Regions:
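Short hydrophobic alpha-helical segments enriched in small aliphatic residues
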Residues: 4-6, 10, 19-22
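N-terminal membrane-targeting hydrophobic helices
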Residues: 14-20, 25-215
């Protein structure tokens, strides 16, 4: 009798486990497939903007700690993928490329960063502008990509999703496995051509002009 009860309990536990885990596994599978279809500029490229700004402005105006804050701000908007994992619809204001990619969000992050201006060895105004441009550049670069939905760049004043008229950056999948197995080389080549080279070239030109004028 004890053995029969044990077998019944085991079957019951297995049934309950399947009932709970199957929907979760299905949701996880749908989430993973959705991430594979989403297009963004890659996490390797968003930090190029704050690095280029730092090169152009020089160490006297942009300290290494502030550069680190700018790099963090440049990739921060893509934390909205956590919402996708939790079931937030892509097209929602709180979905991917929603409010976190807006100018208002960038301004809010920049204001928060000014609280640590002394720690970054920078003025509050300098901290605000550097972090704002670093974070706002994320949505701008995403508007240059060739796939996915547009960007709610002007949220909350407009929930329209925008792309720029010219879209030249090959989109990166948010799936890490797919990025390294399928799209990575093509995406990085595109970003090198359209983001890295222009940004860094402009940065070194501005730096050279500043040094020339300082003599």
């Amino acid at each position: 009798m004890g053995c029969d009860n044990a077998r019944i309990d085991a079957r019951l536990a297995n049934t309950i486990s399947c009932a709970i885990c199957a929907p979760l596994a299905s949701a996880a599978g749908r989430s993973t497939r959705a991430l594979e279809r989403i297009g963004v500029a890659s996490a390797f490229t968003h930090p190029v903007v704050p690095v280029a700004l730092a090169i152009a402005m020089g160490r006297s105006r942009v300290s290494l700690p502030l550069v680190a804050v700018g790099i963090a701000a440049s990739v921060l908007p893509d934390l909205d993928i956590v919402g996708l994992r939790l079931g937030v619809p892509y097209g929602s204001d709180f979905g991917h490329r929603g409010f976190s990619h807006s100018l208002v969000f960038a301004a809010a992050i920049a204001v928060l960063a000014t609280l640590g201006a002394a720690r970054w060895h920078a003025s509050r105004a300098g901290t605000f502008m550097f972090v704002f441009l670093s974070c706002a550049s994320h949505g701008f670069l995403d508007m240059l990509t060739t796939a996915g939905w547009g960007v709610e760049y002007f949220w909350p004043f407009s929930t329209h999703r925008y792309f720029l008229p010219v879209r030249v950056i090959d989109s990166s999948s948010l799936s890490i496995a797919r990025f390294f197995q399928v799209t990575g080389g093509r995406v990085l080549h595109s970003e090198l051509l359209w983001v890295w080279v222009p940004c860094l070239s402009a940065a070194f030109i501005v730096r050279a002009i500043r040094k020339s004028n300082a003599r």
